Amino acid sequence: MANLGLDYFNTHEMSYSNPYTGNAATTAGSLTKAVQRQLSYTFNQLLTYQRNIRSHSLDVMIGHEYYELKQQFLGAQKTGFPFGGLYELSAAATLSGASSQTDKYAIESFLSRVNYNFAQKYYFSASFRTDGSSRFHKDSRWGKFWSLGTSWRISEESFMKKYDWVNNLTLKASFGSQGNDNIGSYYAYQSLYNMGLSNGSLNGAGINSLENKDLKWEKNENYFVIFGIAS
């Protein structure tokens, strides 16, 4: 089974102040225009296998998933209109500001899962996945996460038949790890520069943050044991 999901946003914004009244009268009017686009897609493929043989039941799944996001922004502001009613930047005399930005993010995952039960009494599950995120340096890009779980439906045992008031008595235990790549920046492993330091006719650059190639996946581990009864 394969699935493809696509999201696309295209936003246009305009802010205009006439040159006759208000705060913009001192600058002979003001016009700001901005365009923002965002495209993201998810593509996953899953293979499943199920088999029941007498009291044995097996369910296996393997899969692959890829997600990519691209954001683009472009905006500018100008002042100094000869008269009102002009809504194009080219009609104004003075450039007050302009900026643009592009962000990219991608994550690729390989995953697997196995579920097994015998006689609807003894259950076992295992999963493993590895995820690669563009937020990290190539030497630390991939994280590995897995889980194990088991449960015993005690109420299905023959020695429990005399306790007919117990519908479901279960003992469960599991261990698992999960990963998180949401570290607040798409490019924290790289050195980042502020390119808006102009002096005269030439633009300059100043370092904003140093590279950190040692950034890795945040990993959370969970353990639990549950004893449940229902009548």
Language model features: what each stretch is:
Residues 1-15, 25-231:
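Extracellular/periplasmic, surface-exposed regions of secreted and cell-surface proteins
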Residues 21-22:
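N-terminal transmembrane signal-anchor/hairpin module of polytopic inner-membrane proteins
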